[in-house]
Regions:
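Terminal alpha-helical segments
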Residues: 1-129
Length: 129
């Protein structure tokens, strides 16, 4: 049951992101990356539970795969696109780093919280967080 390890990692990243956001112990760019890791792991655990190994590691790639298998809340589409604004994909061209504002981080935390709830509902997991 490899999917459980992805769920556990996602929950750990989630807790770290929430704590760092509330305590202001990390910069917003670091919090963004922790939130992104949580999102990626939550999506991966759902896909793996259904026996589907994600072809892409990006949030938008996994989201497209999730939509093929599940009825995903429509509002997640806008949140995935929002997260992509800050993603620095591998490229030969140098792209400027976009540092999220406190408001951006709040939106990210809101998204990962909603995603967490949806994942736990799909997997019939009782949250301990």
């Amino acid at each position: 049951m490899e999917w459980k390890s992805y769920y556990t990692e996602a929950a750990d990243y989630y807790k770290a992101a929430i704590g760092a956001s509330q305590k202001k112990t990390l910069g917003n760019l670091v919090i963004y990356n922790v939130v992104a890791m949580s999102i990626e792991n939550y999506m991966t655990c759902v896909l793996m539970k259904t026996g589907f190994i994600p072809e892409h590691a990006s949030i938008s790639g996994m989201f497209r795969e999730l939509k093929k298998l599940y009825e995903v809340p429509e509002e997640f589409q806008a949140d995935v696109r929002f997260m992509n604004r800050f993603m620095n994909f591998c490229s030969l061209e140098v792209a400027p780093v976009i540092v999220p504002t406190d408001e951006d981080v709040g939106r990210m935390i809101s998204f990962v919280s909603s995603l967490k709830g949806w994942v736990e509902s799909c997997l019939e997991i009782k949250s301990t967080i």
